[in-house]
């Protein structure tokens, strides 16, 4: 804890060097508070996820990581125009982004500390001077604008590009208490913003490295009070969250190993194929939900917010036993049966098949090009999983891994290799092969090809509709669809000559105006509406105006001008 506090103090000192002199960097309040409230929350009925009116939805999304990394931002924003990237993702029909983040970053924010993110203003001028918390909310605003929802995923205890390799949700710095407090803070902070529809409590709990497993260093699933019992911690954390925010979906992943007799009575166990005793079932990290049969998550009155969430991959990520033997020569239908019988059914598919819960396949995907010796088998796996998802539409939801190019063993939907360039992409292209053959077939869309979003008012990108625009949609109260995607805004009180705060002249006052004014004060732009920017009517535009603008957008003050 001492190290952690020293680190946080250092981060405060760094952050203060990155902001406009004289401007307070308090981020209490956010654009999320200004969102359309409470019309897009989801819950579970049987093996379906439904909206507040009981209409079935299908979460068909993709992962976009970076806030879990040392850069503390959505990766690819240093390659391209991040707004153009987000708009393209929406136009391609991805209705949810699963966004990995780290516990230490959430906890820092909860303590009023806002570490810096990597500067990408050379590609994204609107991001100039934004700290990690401001940048996160800027991304939420833009996801909202194009009709994309977000599932927030704690990927690792600390911001670390390899943090997913750590097996547990706690370490010597991030305790279980901090883990829970960080999540409860997020719940309180965003409970009125349905851009974030769900929390994936912890990414891929698993065992220690090597074939000799140490129980105390590994995630287990049972009814014990052990600190490493993921079932207990997930249940307690979920209940604490739901007491504050009863509308959010809770996604609970599995573990890696599970004892064949259901009893974790070995302090160590050997999983070597040569020297081990074969007493444990193994699977992908986070993909083993066999324990649900013996020890299901019990959220009491909040049970309708629970969704179990396995992960699954192909042989390029790791050559599991089921990718050997008959799988190699099998046709696609035979291969799918092998995967189902040897992995999917008993590890997680039974949960939806027995009516326990719907599932979110939180990660799947893989390489679709290149010279890897297992590429053909990887493509066979992807076809099998794609078809299995489609066969279980509405019961099996999914978020594809991943959007950005930075995943070494899977690649991304963005690529620098063969693909289609897009405006703002600069050196990035869209991977048509991966998208067209594996993701597009399992995106939620109408019979005539319109993508279906999860927002009731904002259509999904330029090629989609809102859920309330479905022809068979049944509302209790009909939401009014928006003609074009637009951000939630606060309009400044009208005056005879000027709309104070409308620095960019678009008729609204929101965080875009704050970003533009910040760029002006940093000398990055020259032409703004200075009369509108002079929100304290002092006759000059300076950092005081920026501070007032922030307070207005964050709802600390209700009127402009502010004298």
Swiss-Prot record:
It comes from the Bacteria. It catalyses: Endohydrolysis of (1->4)-beta-D-glucosidic linkages in cellulose, lichenin and cereal beta-D-glucans. This is Endoglucanase B. GO terms for molecular function: cellulase activity. Transmembrane segments: none annotated. Belongs to the glycosyl hydrolase 5 (cellulase A) family. Residues 1-27 form the signal peptide. InterPro entries: Dockerin_1_rpt, Dockerin_dom, Dockerin_dom_sf, EF_Hand_1_Ca_BS, Glyco_hydro_5, Glyco_hydro_5_CS, Glycoside_hydrolase_SF. The gene is celB. The active site is at residues 204, 363. Residues 496-562 form the Dockerin domain. Residues 476-495 are annotated as: Disordered. Pfam families: Cellulase, Dockerin_1. Keywords: Carbohydrate metabolism, Cellulose degradation, Glycosidase, Hydrolase, Polysaccharide degradation, Signal. PANTHER family: ENDOGLUCANASE, MAJOR EXTRACELLULAR ENDOGLUCANASE. This enzyme catalyzes the endohydrolysis of 1,4-beta-glucosidic linkages in cellulose, lichenin and cereal beta-D-glucans. Gene3D superfamilies: Dockerin domain, Glycosidases. Its EC number is 3.2.1.4. One of its GO terms (biological process) is cellulose catabolic process.
